[in-house]
Amino acid sequence: MNEKYELTEEFKEIETLREGWLQKIKVYRIRALRAFADVKIGDLGGFVETKQNLSNMGNAWVYGNAEVYDNARVRDNAWVCGDAEVCGDAKVCDNANIFWCSSIGSRHATTTMFRNKDNGITVTCGCFMGTLEEFAERVEKEHGENIFGKEYKLLIELAKIHFGLQDETKGEEENGI
């Protein structure tokens, strides 16, 4: 099997909880050794702790500054992007799709959205975890039209576009098409 990526010498030290103790580990930037999907030979990807974190099969890839470590696995055609952290025993697989935005809202936290096993969208934001619809309701209840509510509502609309949930005809009607 042709390996599709290598670990580069570029690394970051991060802290993770292992066996009840906070430990520093290194995650290494990856570089593509062959072309696949939208990745070209030589493209730099995100960071993994070991080669066990990212499969050489399929079109799975870690983009940007995303980090995959511990026993986490990314495989099949799944993509992990941006500043996402996939860790613990997490599995991102098949055609999984994940989307997040950092430093947003009243807590300046990271809001993560991903396709779940039922093909719905799960949202995590601070201590909230629920569906995209439940998140929208919570945002309306807690923030209404204040600046944080506006940020979250834009993020929800962007997520709908990202996951292909937007109303296709809305844009056409507004543009007179």
For each predicted feature, which ranges?
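N-terminal, helix-rich and Lys/Arg-enriched segments in bacterial and organellar proteins
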Residues: 32-37, 66, 78, 120, ...
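Generic N-terminal leader/processing signal
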Residues: 10, 38, 69, 75, ...
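Extended, small-residue-rich solenoid/repeat segments and analogous flexible loops
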Residues: 1-63, 67-69, 177
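A detector of tandem-repeat and repeat-rich interaction/domain scaffolds
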Residues: 55-98
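Generic structural motif
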Residues: 33-35, 51, 89, 95, ...
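Intrinsically disordered, low-complexity terminal regions
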Residues: 1-6, 97-177
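Arginine residue identity/basic-tract feature
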Residues: 18, 29-34, 73-75, 107, ...
